[in-house]
Amino acid sequence: MTLLSPGIENKEINLASAIGRAATGRAAMVGKFEWGPAYSITQVTSESDLVTIFGRPNDYTAASFMTANNFLKYGNDLRLVRICDATTAQNATPLYNAVEYTIGASNGCVVGDDITITYSGVGALTAKGKVLEVDAGNNNAASKIFLPSAEIVAAAKSDGNYPSVGTITLQPTQGDIALTNIEIIDTGSVYFPNIELAFDALTAIETEGGALKYADLIEKQGFPRLSARYVGDFGDAISVEIINYADYQTAFAFAAGHTLGDIELPIYPDGGTRSINLSSYFTFGPSNSNQYAVIVRVSGEVEEAFIVSTNPGDKDVNGQSIFIDEYFENSGSAYITAIAEGWKTESGAYNFGGGSDANAGADDWMFGLDMLSDPEVLYTNLVIAGNAAAEEVSIASTVQKYAIDSVGNVRQDCVVFVSPPQSLIVNKQAGTAVANIQGWRTGIDPTNGQAVVDNLNVSTTYAVIDGNYKYQYDKYNDRNRWVPLAGDIAGLCAYTDQVSQPWMSPAGFNRGQIKGVNRLAVDLRRAHRDALYQIGINPVVGFAGQGFVLYGDKTATQQASAFDRINVRRLFNLLKKAISDAAKYRLFELNDEFTRSSFKSEIDAYLTNIQDLGGVYDFRVVCDETNNPGSVIDRNEFVASIYVKPAKSINFITLNFVATSTDADFAEIIG
């Protein structure tokens, strides 16, 4: 402000700005996992994180899981996007194997009465149904019933009708009930890829003339709106026990012959009961009739126990909200989610089923990769796409080519790591495997000159291709698996950043040692390596007593230039990121001599440090009136030109051994 009377005004101006070092070891990957949020970017820093968030490997997910885990053996910052097929994926729910029905003629029923169920060819079933609601204005006709499903499902599968059923007749204790349109629900009946979309999915109801939605079906069964937190058949192992305030108090009331904490819960939708002791899981229980004790089991083992409430104002002893909607939205459970709407007041145990996440196609991989394409949303400099190589050749080629074209070439600040399709190289003779890789890489089969439709015929400096597979032990399933090497090659880049600098090559005996290899798919001899290296494929080779080594550092370009090496590509990615971040602070400043010279000084200082560390041989920065003439200034532009002589890695070593006579003069020979 302007002083209007004598005084002192302090102003602070910062002229000490500098260019900071950009992170270089962050990787991103899209893949198939058995658990975890789908189509959401999640940070993973360790194998423990990976297992906790995304589950363990199985035959469907092993390539993605082990590729991600292999990267984490070298680096510690991985951003993952789980994919699934939205048309077939399902969250597991208590609706699976519940009996869906339409009540026809009914009268004279009483709420709470048992229902005897008779199945054609089987007779009366052991488990009894229950009348849940009646319509007093319609002769006490039953409007909602519960039918325990375990015996019905078994009978339907036995007679080959499942998910349809044979003839079922019902006889309540009082009155009559006749059913039509009886079916067994054979899916989870709801899909949401991540928790942000859960509420809408759990509240959606039937549109006029449309099929019943999850909310309609769950309400009809009389169940609370519960679901597995994520899609996938891992959710089928979940079981949830809910105990209301009154039953919790009764469980801890003194009574002859009663063990404190014991309670018996009806099981839905199967039927039967389950006995548990609450004192094993809770130190305090529900404090009012709005609150419920919840126990979550996975494969029968208790994983979580907590208190939730249907009242939006309720909090726990730490002041955190336990309102059902907020509790689950805020990651209160790692396994389930629920909403307060439609919550049931009765206690019960609910078995989940119907989860699915199989059949992800190339389109699903592409949707996931699209989430990595915007550098303003996510900064990453290593993109792993080679886990898709375990898919069939057409998907492997399409997905990896898309990763290069739509992520690497669009962002131009990262390197995409790809691997050859597994079926082309695993269990093949070396000559056949090399020919297969050549055909895939060039689009021309070298054995007959025919076009190869599913190929990786691209030329770019923003991709790196490896040329082998490793046979690796899967400790989670006690077996060995063939795994693509893209995660390891990206990991070597992160490891190189840790022990050296990004502009150093990740290949060779010093920094290129591949971990966790039992054996390689192909033993690449010199002739094989020569053939692959000429088309930009980096061999991975086993040397007796010296480990398994990345034995090449080319990018995927077919043009001879400085950028045909990984270290130069990564050097320039680093420079572009760091200097462009600093350039943001010149936006909306004046294009004058002070702005230009200060920016040039920052770049000079930054590049001098890079030069001192061996990243560049020399550089020159031009940011003055020669490239910022009046015409540039009048267009509100600002131009800086940065010339760099990048350091080159050694790929070929020549050792000249010369024998001379005993009295030869080296000065004369060498000069």
UniProtKB/Swiss-Prot annotation:
Q: Which residues form a coiled coil?
A: none
Record key words, sorted: Host cytoplasm, Viral contractile tail ejection system, Viral genome ejection through host cell envelope, Viral penetration into host cytoplasm, Viral tail protein, Viral tail sheath protein, Virion, Virus entry into host cell
Q: Which GO terms describe its biological process?
A: symbiont genome ejection through host cell envelope, contractile tail mechanism
What is the predominant subcellular site recorded for this chain?
virion
Q: What does this protein do?
A: Polymerizes as an extended structure around the baseplate-tail tube complex. During ejection, the sheath shifts to a contracted form, thereby making the inner tail tube protrude through the host cell envelope.
Q: How does it assemble?
A: Homomultimer.
Record's family? Belongs to the myoviridae tail sheath protein family.
Official protein name in the record: Tail sheath protein
Please name the source species: Vibrio phage KVP40 (isolate Vibrio parahaemolyticus/Japan/Matsuzaki/1991) (KVP40)
